[in-house]
Amino acid sequence: MSRIPVKMSAVLLTGHGGFERLRYREDVDVPSAAAGKVLIKVLAAGVNNTDINTRTAWYSKSVTGETSTGGAEGFETADDDDGSWSGTPLAFPRIQGADCCGEIVAVGEGVDDNRIGERVLVRTMQQAAVDYQPFKCWTVGSECDGGFAQYMLAYSAEAFKVESDWSDIELASIPCAYSTAENLLERANVTSGETVFITGASGGVGSAAVQLAKRRGAVVIAQTSKEKVAEVRSIGATQVVTREQKLTDTVGTESVDVVIDLVAGNAFPDLLELLKTGGRYAASGAIAGPIVELDVRTLYLKDLTLIGCTFQEQKVFENLIGYIERNEIKPLVAKSYPLKDIVQAQQDFLAKKYVGKLVLVPPQH
């Protein structure tokens, strides 16, 4: 095993704002493995909406627009005091990166030395840091440093060994997007034979949700742009509709059991109309805007259940590792980039001209 260096390359987020807040450095201190933690050599790290949303402080209630509108330059109205997952100010500089596939190279006190050499995925929505309290989480790349570096620290309990012939880049596409998607389906209690409508189906979470819903035996109706219809159908959607089509006409009112929504915005009222009486709506994103119009009569007269999904039960990530190892899901990587090209990767992410995930690769020396 190679010697652990003193310094490493990393991308530092120096504050909320635009791309200018991302600084690629080659002189960042390599962290030491503290008690209960492991030092991981990062082999690859995926790009996610949350990385951009955290950078721009989109999570602040002072921001009401689409995620993409401030993706390049940030939001002038953003309040730094509540711009994180936890609703508390971030500590800067912060190393972002919600996804990490890596190799354990050192362990802290109380961690078995035999873990050294394991290839692992780091759980994005961590629980060890908050003592496994329900509905509390510690997000990688937000409340603690993440994978946009050559090395990162993680609680040993949050670094899940994975045995698979997938590449590092393919594995790095999994933690944030697939756990978010699996959690949405789990919280909505999607079962075999049910019809599920998925918005934003070409993105990382949406494409994962299509696969994972299909794995559960659901009938999947997916929404995407007209350019991506064939690709979304190829990963398991039974029916694909485009954003230009009127949902209530194309899909039909009272026609689906569950809506998995990553988009929100102006389409929200129509999504509720698609649901059968007693249907479930689960959300974990609002890329088209967080402020929606709700006719409360639709909610109560149809006996709908609205579910917000952030916190994940322990079994969600454990199940994902099993799906990978049994080849029950497949990775969907559109492109990879050197870590130093993070701005280009995020520009391509915001352009949304691909299906699946974009992945960054740190220097491997």
Predicted segments with their positions:
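Glycine-rich beta-strand-centered segment in the early N-terminal region that forms part
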Residues: 29-45, 60-126
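NAD(P)H dinucleotide-binding glycine-rich loop of Rossmann-like/cofactor-binding domains
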Residues: 75-95, 122-200
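Adenosine-nucleotide cofactor-binding segment
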Residues: 195-198, 214-270
